[in-house]
Amino acid sequence: MIENQLIKGEIVAALLAVEKDFENCRFVSCDFSEKEISGVSFSNCEFSSCNLSMARMNKTSFHSVIFNDCKMLGLYFDQCNPFGLTVAFNNCILNHSSFYKTKLKGIGFLNCQLIETDFTQTDLSSGSFSGSNLSGAHFEQSNLEKCDFRMAIHYSINPTMNRIKKARFSKEEIHGLLSCFDLSIE
């Protein structure tokens, strides 16, 4: 187990070859893109300015992990270990990723790009999408109760196919809730 370390740049590939458990570590400018991180456990870790695009994450554990300014294209969080999955994203690009059937109560997606991201059957209750772009994101049979979408843009959420009780939306983006009804709003 590697604990309490600052891990920068290219050293991460060598570490992943020999170690599978990281606790209280900070990863800065590391390239995990297309890397095999299946079965690796990250606990109380922070990733800053890292590239995790297309990383393979089968049974990967993320417990109390924060991602800041990371590029994370095409990731399948639905393949991660669901036990204790707690993550937060700040200024991250998560386009074309999948959170299918994951439980992420209270999650924060702050100022993120979530273009064409799949949230089908995902529990996002009490989460926040403040400042995030949800263009083409897919919500179906998702729990969005008490979610904050007030500062989010370009979302399209069908209220008849998702749980949205007590969720908060801005007047400017209300058309994202009504587009499924083919209404003319002027």
Predicted regions and their residues:
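Tandem repeat scaffolds
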Residues: 1-186
